[in-house]
Amino acid sequence: MAQCGGGDVSRHRKGHLDTVESLCQGLLDDVMLDDDKCRAMFGYLQEWQDLASMCYGSLGGEPPLAPEASNGSGSTGGGGSFRKRRPDDAKGESNSICKRQRGKQQQQQQPCHPDQMAAAVGKGRPERARPGAKKKAEVASPKDSPATSASTVTAGQKTDYIHVRARRGQATDSHSLAERVRRERISERMRYLQELVPGCNKVTGKAGMLDEIINYVQSLQKQVEFLSMKIAASNPVVNFNIVEDLFGRQLSQAACNPAALPAMALPMAQVEPSCLQMSPLQQMQTSAGSSGYGLEMVVSNQYSPPGGPMSVPAGASVEPCLNVNGAAGWDIGSHGLFSGFDAPFQSVQSDCLLDNLKMEM
């Protein structure tokens, strides 16, 4: 009998377990349809834990755990607000929990190296990238393009001039090149002057060279002035325009009044009208009898006589003018010439011969 009673009890417990499992499964399946029943059941289990332990203890199972309250408001009252749980969400949470557990187990199984630990510590707090750092990196490593490649090629080749950016107050490359050419030309001319000026090779610097060249040119100018003065003193140039005017006046008076013609000794060849013209290239030869020195004087006649070409009239007598010796004696009014031509013209016999004195006109 006792054995029969024990078998009945075990069968009764199994039947209770089956009924409880079926009820729980039905509640989980129909949680969306019958939310109030689910809340009531779990609320009762939470309120009377002893009752739940007694029920599950009598059935030989463990009591279910209390569900987590939403937003940390898990109260012990039966009327506590629980979040709605869908079966899909429950399955997804269970899957995620399993995955997390597996991942943790794998991490625990894998050995960690010290380098990996340091990298993990460094990656724990990522630093924020500064806004200017990216631009600097782009400028430091520009993209490959034909323009950049050309610039790198030109940068590799050294230029003769200094590269200057075209900014305000600064020159461009073309301007600097023109300036370099201009300075080269100036240096070449300075070399030529340095070769011409004696003693300029010893001077260093363009300023000193220019001072030396200026001093040399000034000394040359002074030498030229001194030489010109010396030449003028050795070869005096006499202007006989006054003498020509005097002769022209006397000849005009003689043409008007032949009796007033002074005693002038003229050769026959000079009586012709062509010989009486006062041309600048006419040459006259006279001699100083007393001194005996030959004096060569250059007569510069720039103007023709006021009366133009003059001729001696046919009625004028020139026979008294001839000298016995065959030479022509000139009656020169020296007193009237040096007294301002105020005194009357007085004829003075002179023994000057034409062969000894040369007068270039």
Swiss-Prot record:
One of its GO terms (molecular function) is protein dimerization activity. A motif (Nuclear localization signal) lies at residues 166-173. Residues 66-159 are annotated as: Disordered. Residues 170-183 are annotated as: Basic motif. This is Basic helix-loop-helix protein 79. It comes from Oryza sativa subsp. indica (Rice). It is found in: Nucleus. The lineage of its organism: Eukaryota, Viridiplantae, Streptophyta, Embryophyta, Tracheophyta. Residues 184-220 are annotated as: Helix-loop-helix motif. Belongs to the bHLH protein family. Residues 146-157 have a biased composition (Polar residues). Residues 124-138 have a biased composition (Basic and acidic residues). Its main location: nucleus. Keywords: Gibberellin signaling pathway, Nucleus, Transcription, Transcription regulation. GO terms for cellular component: nucleus. Pfam families: HLH (PF00010). Together with BCL1, positive regulator of cell elongation at least partially through increased gibberellic acid (GA) biosynthesis.
